[in-house]
A protein has these predicted regions:
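Active-site glycine/GP-rich loop and adjacent strand/helix microenvironment
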Residues: 125-224
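Conserved AMP-binding loop of ANL adenylate-forming enzymes
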Residues: 82, 86-122, 132-135
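Intrinsically disordered, low-complexity coil segments
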Residues: 11-17, 116-128
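Nucleotide 5′-phosphate-binding alpha/beta core
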Residues: 1-56, 62-95, 102, 150-157, ...
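Short low-complexity stretches enriched in small and charged residues
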Residues: 48-58, 106-114, 137-141, 161, ...
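Acidic, low-complexity intrinsically disordered regions
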Residues: 15-18, 73, 115, 141-143, ...
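Short Asp/Glu-rich motifs
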Residues: 77, 108, 218
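A short secondary-structure junction signal
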Residues: 67-69, 108-110, 168
């Protein structure tokens, strides 16, 4: 991809690649990723970075983008995941519940949910380690709430809008979730009103994560 225009930029700057030259390199746009995805992939991936993995963005802001990751990008993602858990003092031996959208959901995710042996690759090296329960966010909120009551997780991860809907369900029924120790939001802009709803329902502060499939973690909410 860059071979098409970098030689011209370098020639115009007598082969110099200083900051002034870098500023002439066009900023990569989402449309560029969609139109030139294959030519943006490295042709010489180091052996130590293999195997490659593939993925796709959610398409929440437009047409999805196809992605290619490496062993190194996976390691970095897991490292930042673990750092977030440790920053917020989460008990890795407890249960984590995740409610989100799945591109190709297992039938159980639309009904009783699934139980996984660990929270994921970032924590599976620890012992004792907690399990994870997952459910599709397309399930009605009332059913999600019943499922949470049955699963009794220590931590709940979902979208801000879904967390707010669950908090409203909890307040309407005047029933809390005694096991809950932490709430984590992903995938959407978190508002002050949504924070307040969770505070009122569960006496807990939402810990927000800002990330994207294309680049991984962008920001973690400060523990302070």
């Amino acid at each position: 991809y860059y071979r098409d225009f970098l030689p011209d930029i370098l020639a115009a700057n007598r082969g110099s690649m200083d900051w002034a030259t870098w500023r002439q390199v066009p900023i990569l746009q989402r449309a560029d990723l969609q139109a030139h995805g294959q030519s943006l992939n490295s042709e010489r991936v180091p052996e130590s970075h293999l195997p490659l993995s593939t993925g796709k963005t959610s398409g929440s802001t437009g047409r999805p983008v196809d992605l290619v990751g490496t062993r190194l990008t996976d390691a970095m993602w897991n490292a930042f995941t673990l750092r977030g858990h440790l920053w917020h003092g989460r008990d890795l031996s407890a249960r984590l519940a995740t409610i989100k959208i799945f591109a190709q959901p297992h039938p159980a995710l639309l009904d009783q949910g699934l139980v996984l042996p660990t929270w994921g690759p970032a924590t599976e090296m620890f012992s004792p380690r907690g399990d994870a329960v997952i459910l599709s966010a397309t399930v009605p909120v009332s059913q999600q709430w019943r499922w949470l009551k049955a699963q009794q997780p220590a931590y709940l991860l979902s979208y801000p809008s879904n967390l707010a809907a669950l908090a409203e369900e909890s307040l309407q029924q005047d029933v809390g979730l005694e096991s809950l120790r932490g709430v984590i939001s992903i995938g959407e802009r978190l508002t002050a009103a949504q924070r307040q709803l969770c505070r009122a329902a569960w006496q807990l502060e939402i810990k927000d994560i800002y990330s994207a499939e294309e680049v991984g973690y962008i920001a973690h909410q400060s523990p302070q």
